[in-house]
């Protein structure tokens, strides 16, 4: 995803996917703050801390599966749902690194700049996704940084908080 999206000219965070402990250490030293998550699966995003870099723990964890490391991007969580040619976007106010852990997260509808809305549609087309949820970080400097496009996103909570007609649009797409 990241490579294909980056080729569209969309900004992405510095990223490494690896199961080599030395690569993890070098990446951690190269960035002030690093987050990690599984390459595949729904496990939540975590901050990479000194305990994770302990040699035995790191080697044991990386024997099981590679991880995705990313430089932490300061800012606000933004999620855009793309359903065909419709794009619905909201800011997610949460104190948690991974908003899925925060039962008190507040979801507020927001307007995307036209160029970012076009990027959403281009990302969905490039990844062959008729419908998707795209996660962004909106930096304090006003830049949108792509994090991922989820091909099978949960949406009911989001729909209830925003009033966006996601279910209706999804049913319409499936009926076509």
Regions found by a protein language model. Name each.
Residues 111, 125, 129, 138-176:
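C-terminal active-site "lid" helix and adjoining low-complexity regulatory extension at the edge
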Residues 1-12:
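Conserved N-proximal alpha/beta basic substrate-recognition cap immediately N-terminal to
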Residues 67, 129-132:
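PAS/PAS-like sensory domains
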Residues 34, 88, 132, 145-147:
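Protein kinase-like catalytic core scaffold
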Residues 14-19, 49:
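Short acidic-hydrophobic, aromatic-tinged amphipathic segments that line or gate anion-handling sites
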Residues 134-136:
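Hydrophobic residue at the +6 position relative to the catalytic HRD Asp in the kinase catalytic loop
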């Amino acid at each position: 995803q990241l490579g294909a999206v980056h080729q569209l000219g969309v900004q992405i965070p510095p990223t490494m996917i690896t199961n080599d402990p030395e690569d993890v250490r070098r990446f951690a030293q190269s960035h002030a703050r690093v987050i990690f998550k599984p390459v595949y699966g729904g496990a939540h995003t975590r901050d990479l801390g000194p305990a994770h870099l302990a040699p035995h723990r790191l080697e044991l964890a990386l024997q099981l599966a590679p991880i995705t490391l990313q430089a932490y991007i300061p800012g606000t969580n933004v999620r855009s749902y793309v359903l065909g040619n419709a794009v619905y976007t909201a800011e997610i106010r949460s104190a948690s690194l991974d908003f899925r852990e925060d039962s008190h997260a507040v979801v507020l509808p927001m307007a995307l700049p036209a160029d970012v809305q076009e990027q959403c549609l281009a990302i969905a087309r490039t990844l062959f996704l008729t419908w998707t949820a795209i996660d962004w970080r909106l930096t304090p400097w006003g830049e949108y940084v792509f994090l991922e496009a989820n091909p099978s996103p949960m949406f009911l909570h989001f729909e209830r908080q925003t009033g966006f007609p996601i279910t209706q649009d999804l049913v319409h797409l499936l009926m076509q």
